Amino acid sequence: MSIEILNESGHPLDVKRLAALSRFVMDRMRVHPLAELCIKAVDEPTIAQLNEQWMEKAGPTDVLAFPMDELRPGLVDEDPEEGVLGDLVLCPDVAARQGETAGHGTEAEIELLTVHGILHLLGYDHAEPEEHREMFGLQDELLAAWRAR
């Protein structure tokens, strides 16, 4: 898997751990081994501008997901499709505030947002109650497996 991580946020970021987490999630979701993912960490003004431009929402957000080739999780008996999974844009400053509020710190929040974003890239959503249960249940499972290894 090709995982590119760019940190333009001014906030320290454990790039190796983030790449390992991304690889772990993509493996668990049976994404093709040659799939590509780019994660970019940005500051609040940058993510606020992207949020306004692409989501038509004012203000900063924690993570934005931009799928490319509409890859989906692989099935047990099928070969997954090759392609570009897409781009994630994270804001560590927003993650720091959310992590503090949740009581688990910035790094844990960035991990959560990374898993959340990858699931969005794979077509998961949480607009409807059933989708919310499925996506957040899977997110919790993946994070628990990552932290238990």
UniProtKB/Swiss-Prot annotation:
Q: List keywords of the entry alphabetically.
A: Cytoplasm, Endonuclease, Hydrolase, Metal-binding, Nuclease, Ribosome biogenesis, rRNA processing, Zinc
Entry note: cofactor: Binds 1 zinc ion.
Q: Where does Zn(2+) bind?
A: H116, H120, H126
Name its co-factor(s). Answer: Zn(2+)
What is the enzyme's class at the highest EC level? Answer: hydrolase
InterPro entries recorded: MetalPrtase_cat_dom_sf_prd, YbeY, YbeY_CS
Q: Name one GO molecular function term.
A: RNA endonuclease activity
Coiled-coil intervals = none
Q: Does the keyword Transmembrane apply?
A: no
Among its keywords, does the record have Protease? no
The family note in this entry says:
Belongs to the endoribonuclease YbeY family.
Q: Which GO terms describe its cellular component?
A: cytoplasm
General function of this protein: Single strand-specific metallo-endoribonuclease involved in late-stage 70S ribosome quality control and in maturation of the 3' terminus of the 16S rRNA.
Localization: Cytoplasm
What GO biological process, any one, is recorded here? rRNA processing
Q: Entry's Gene3D superfamilies?
A: Metalloproteases ('zincins'), catalytic domain
What's the protein here called? Endoribonuclease YbeY
- Species source reads Nocardioides sp. (strain ATCC BAA-499 / JS614)
For this protein, the Enzyme Commission number is 3.1.-.-
